[in-house]
């Protein structure tokens, strides 16, 4: 690529519009706003990129940097269009997502409705194990309960799984063991471990974050794969 002809491209994908800005070597800007294609966001990106490159009379290979922002993950959560997601947690903590921190918008309103958790109750599986807050093993991981959890994940045909065990932020050993077993039996499943995503104290926040990450992983993976394929048609090096 000729460095003297290098350009920078910004793409921001929203639910309604996709905005593109191309910065050319001489400092001029070429902009475009196109309708987003919700079924396949990459279509609007590809169309918009082709337009700005043509208007600027530059080739895709002259784009040095692509900066991309998207609401794909946010929309998947808001619209509840994420993956069929399961949760593996410590025995006794299956209902943590509902219990939360007992904070209600209207404290004394018994009829108020709360948003449903991203993981259905039947897709939450418990394993017998326990660590204390120092990461010391109080109860070793029970392999039989772990195997039952994996069997449940397989029978429900889940696409993604969040593994969030109590006090895993202090010691990820049990989470890693569960994840290794899942990968061995179900290599196609997208896995998210709380000890990797948010290794911090406070179980509800850690579990919610891990579940949200698992919920959108397959959606984003498909989106980015499609986007990379799209970029192959405009530049010989989509990863550069």
Outline where the language-model segments fall.
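Conserved small/polar residues in nucleotide/adenosyl-binding loops
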Residues: 233-240
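Glycine-rich phosphate-binding loops at beta-strand->alpha-helix junctions
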Residues: 165-174
């Amino acid at each position: 690529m000729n460095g003297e002809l290098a350009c920078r491209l910004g793409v921001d994908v929203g639910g309604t519009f996709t905005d593109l800005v191309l910065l050319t070597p001489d400092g001029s800007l070429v902009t475009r706003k196109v309708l987003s294609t919700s079924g396949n966001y990459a279509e609007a990106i590809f169309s918009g990129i082709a337009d700005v490159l043509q208007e600027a009379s530059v080739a895709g290979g002259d784009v040095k940097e692509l900066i991309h922002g998207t609401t794909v993950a946010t929309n998947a959560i808001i619209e509840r269009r994420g993956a069929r997601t399961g949760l593996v947690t410590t025995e006794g903590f299956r209902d943590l997502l509902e219990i939360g921190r007992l904070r209600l918008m209207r404290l004394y309103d018994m009829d108020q409705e709360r948003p449903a958790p991203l993981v259905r109750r039947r897709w939450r599986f418990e394993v017998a194990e326990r660590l204390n807050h120092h990461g010391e093993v109080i109860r070793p991981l029970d392999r039989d309960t772990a195997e039952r959890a994996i069997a449940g994940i397989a029978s429900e045909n889940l696409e993604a799984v969040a593994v969030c065990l109590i006090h895993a932020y202090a010691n990820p050993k049990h989470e890693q063991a569960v994840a290794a077993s899942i990968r061995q039996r179900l290599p196609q499943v997208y896995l998210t471990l709380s000890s990797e995503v948010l290794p911090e104290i406070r179980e509800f926040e850690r579990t919610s974050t891990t579940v949200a990450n698992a919920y959108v992983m397959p959606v984003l993976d498909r989106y980015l794969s499609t986007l990379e394929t799209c970029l192959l048609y405009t530049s010989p090096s989509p990863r550069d």
